[in-house]
Amino acid sequence: MNNTISPGEVLRVIKERIENFDNQVKADSVGEVISIKDGIAIVYGLEKAKFGEVVVFTNGVTGIVLGLDCDTASVVIFGNERSVGEGDTAKCTGKLMDVPVGFELLGRVVDALGNPIDGAGNVDSKIRLPVEIKAPGIIARQSVSEPLQTGIKVIDMLIPIGRGQRELIIGDRKTGKTAIAIDTIINQKLHNDTVSEKEKVYCIYVAIGQKNSAIARIVDKLRVSGALEYTIVVAAGASDTVSFQYLAPYAACAMGEFFRDNGMHCLIVYDDLSKHAVAYRQMSLLLRRPPGREAYPGDVFFLHSRLLERAAKMSDEKGAGSLTALPIIETQAGDVSAYVPTNVISITDGQIFLESEIFYKGFRPAVNVGLSVSRVGSAAQIKSVKKVAGSVKLSLAQYRELEDFAKFGSDIDVHSKKVLDRGRRMMELLKQKQYSPLSVAEQVAVIFAGTSGCLDDISVNNVGKFEEMLLKELNENYPDVLSNISNNFTDDVKDLLLDIISKVTSSFK
């Protein structure tokens, strides 16, 4: 038996192997960390690095390239900077920063990278989206036409917000800015419980630079009220690095865009963009960028405009989804003419202005109706709201003017006294306790009681009690009237509502 292998056979096998050899050479752009300070790593050798590219260090910590020089790249670290040292290698990934998105994140508390921090296990999301993408163009949008109810009388009646709008909440510290945003999120439960999955409003709350105790309190309130099940909380607290505080709103916006681009509706609250601008200023100064006004870098306007422009009401061809933004700005001593407040005011579609003076007088929410405005929301109001609330803002303006005049102690004619009396009752009607949102029909019924003059004979101190009794009467004995108010506020419904109001007011005489 001949076991020898012929040379020809060997040659054939070698030729076959050479022909089938798949030489896949992958060239990586690798650099070396030459210095690290305050969360910024200076890396030498990343010649092919691109601005915004994700870089991975030796120990698996990631970073983003936010500065490019001749020989070095400045990389902002996302993670424990102490685990990155001089001499470590840094490798370009060729990717942009992305985060997990989808329904799996609902009810969870995550950090700026989408990692869960609530101790409830991993987030099993299969979809990831880049944190920074271009805002929808002109053709991809349509005008704001659907209302987004906050459940707060003074806002829904006088400063209405529509789906796809950017409405700024601005005011000094401790004036109730976060309270309005949280009430709006809680109010969506009234809406979500009665509509299909496609029509639900999903919510995202972004905490930037806040105390962890305050974030925990908000999460607990959302959980107790049943709102956490349709809400994502993205937290970058005061103890987190500036890189996380900078990235958090963009990451949250990407999560919201998942709902918007799939024909659904999402509400996102940025709390707050003042701290976001401060974090970006700190990061920019560490990156050796030249400072401008108030030491902010020159592109601080673009920082917020590219974020807020991603909120939109999409066209029917794009699924008709929406992303509504409620950015929050904290002012110092009521100064709305500072750099960041004026920037965000010019970007947004209106502002809800909260004043300390009004707050300390006991008027909550402390909204200054005269300075607050909604530039596009009125187009989204339902007919019953337009009928009832159309004249309220004008009558309140007349009331404030006469109130200033009356302080001088001059004699007031009968008409002016009537305007003052009705104005005081109207202001009392617009007061509302925190965490007690009202449906649109309930708001219309309450405001109608004030505008129709039915409360003129009730003392101002009893207006709050009257409101409680009216809402109780409507919900217990006349639920069909409330549904008719929402659908079509006809003269018949109006007459029936007047009878109910008269019945309630009679108990105060």
Curated annotation (Swiss-Prot):
Domain of life: Bacteria
Stored NCBIfam families: atpA, PRK13343.1
Positions that bind ATP: G171, D172, R173, K174, T175, G176, K177, T178
A Pfam family matched in the record: ATP-synt_ab_N
Subunit text: F-type ATPases have 2 components, CF(1) - the catalytic core - and CF(0) - the membrane proton channel. CF(1) has five subunits: alpha(3), beta(3), gamma(1), delta(1), epsilon(1). CF(0) has three main subunits: a(1), b(2) and c(9-12). The alpha and beta chains form an alternating ring which encloses part of the gamma chain. CF(1) is attached to CF(0) by a central stalk formed by the gamma and epsilon chains, while a peripheral stalk is formed by the delta and b chains.
The organism of origin for this protein: Ehrlichia canis (strain Jake)
Record-linked HAMAP family: ATP_synth_alpha_bact
Sites marked Required for activity: S372
Cited SUPFAM superfamilies: C-terminal domain of alpha and beta subunits of F1 ATP synthase, N-terminal domain of alpha and beta subunits of F1 ATP synthase, P-loop containing nucleoside triphosphate hydrolases
Nuclease keyword on record: no
GO molecular function, one term: ATP binding
Entry's Gene Ontology cellular component terms: plasma membrane; proton-transporting ATP synthase complex
Keywords: ATP synthesis, ATP-binding, Cell inner membrane, Cell membrane, CF(1), Hydrogen ion transport, Ion transport, Membrane, Nucleotide-binding, Translocase, Transport
The name this protein goes by in its record: ATP synthase subunit alpha
InterPro entries recorded: ATP_synth_asu-like_sf, ATP_synth_asu_C, ATP_synth_asu_C_sf, ATP_synth_F1_a_nt-bd_dom, ATP_synth_F1_asu, ATPase_a/bsu_AS, ATPase_F1/V1/A1_a/bsu_N, ATPase_F1/V1/A1_a/bsu_N_sf
Task performed by this protein: Produces ATP from ADP in the presence of a proton gradient across the membrane. The alpha chain is a regulatory subunit.
